């Protein structure tokens, strides 16, 4: 597990949000899931994001809840931002670095080349670069390894991020389309073999939907994600030597938001976990 020789900038990861891009409750949703969250703030959730602590402070994803998420970290000054991809829910918080808010100076923006191109094609985001609020930086380091995964790649690509440390390697994979495509791309037959090849002891994994029947007013196949139900069939019960697998990026409809649901209990009994805001992971 130890990663000797790594230039260690970060020594801890904090989970700053666990929901899908729009959070919970969602605008316009009148279903029980969001009405419950409006009535009971303990059921509200911020979009998925990570705080990176150590010699510097960084974040992964810039969500609409950026201000509240940074407050969870003591309102620390941000040195860099890592992006997995450029769907709106993962980048809309970038505007907070502009003149209307922080007016930051040369905060590093670490993203893939196709995301760089996407940012520079949009006047709002491009201004953040031209005004010096953000500056592009390398999309890898001794401690952070991007791994490309398939996820609706018409405009830009998507990556998982592997954070390497002396105590744990943490894989962050909040979005991908299907296990078949992802495993084919990375060259493994099942998720656990892939995680083992990365020496990942903690996996923060796409848990968007529990099953294929959650979206009542949309065609769910147009929002591709492996369901949790499918994923745990591939994983089976957790065995000695398996990594901690923690499901994040939960859609507002996902029954895993309720700790007393049958689905939550099934997952828990198999040895897997649901992410909670404020969880900390030592690197």
Language model regions located:
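Active-site metal-binding motif and surrounding structural segment of the metallo-beta-lactamase
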Residues: 55-110
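Residue-level marker for buried hydrophobic side chains located in beta-strands
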Residues: 58-60, 82, 170-172, 203, ...
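A short alpha->loop->secondary-structure connector
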Residues: 76-78, 101-105, 125-137
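Short internal beta-strands
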Residues: 107-116, 204, 246-248
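Residue-level marker for beta-strand->alpha-helix junctions and adjacent short loops that shape enzyme
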Residues: 20, 88, 116, 210, ...
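A short, active-site helix/loop in glycosyltransferases that binds the activated sugar's phosphate group
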Residues: 113-125
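Core dinuclear metal-dependent hydrolase active-site scaffold
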Residues: 5-73, 136-190, 195-196, 279-283
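Cap/insert and terminal regions of metallo-dependent hydrolase folds
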Residues: 169, 177-278
């Amino acid at each position: 597990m130890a990663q000797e020789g790594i230039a260690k900038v970060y020594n801890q990861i904090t989970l700053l949000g666990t929901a899908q891009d729009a959070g919970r409750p969602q605008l316009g949703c009148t279903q029980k899931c969001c009405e419950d969250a409006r009535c009971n703030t303990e059921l509200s959730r911020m979009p998925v994001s990570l705080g990176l602590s150590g010699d510097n402070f960084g974040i992964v994803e810039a969500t609409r809840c950026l201000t509240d998420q940074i407050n969870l970290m003591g309102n620390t000054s941000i040195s860099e931002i890592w992006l997995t991809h450029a769907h709106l829910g993962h980048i809309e918080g970038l505007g907070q670095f502009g003149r209307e808010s922080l007016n930051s100076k040369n905060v590093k923006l670490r993203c893939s080349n196709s995301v760089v191109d996407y940012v520079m094609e949009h006047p709002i985001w491009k201004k953040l670069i031209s005004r010096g609020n953000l500056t592009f930086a390398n999309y890898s380091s001794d401690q952070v390894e991007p791994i490309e995964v398939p996820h609706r790649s018409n405009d830009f690509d998507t990556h998982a991020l592997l954070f390497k440390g002396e105590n744990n390697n943490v894989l962050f994979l909040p979005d991908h389309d299907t296990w078949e495509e992802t495993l084919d791309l990375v060259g493994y037959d099942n998720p656990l073999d892939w995680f083992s090849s990365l020496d990942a002891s903690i996996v923060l994994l796409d848990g968007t939907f529990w099953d294929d029947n959650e979206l009542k007013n949309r065609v769910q196949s147009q929002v591709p994600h492996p369901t949790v139900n499918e994923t745990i069939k591939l994983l089976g019960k957790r065995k000695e030597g398996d990594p901690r697998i923690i499901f994040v990026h939960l859609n507002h409809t996902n029954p895993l938001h309720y700790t007393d649901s049958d689905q939550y209990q099934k997952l828990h009994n198999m040895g897997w976990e649901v992410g909670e805001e404020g969880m900390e992971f030592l690197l």
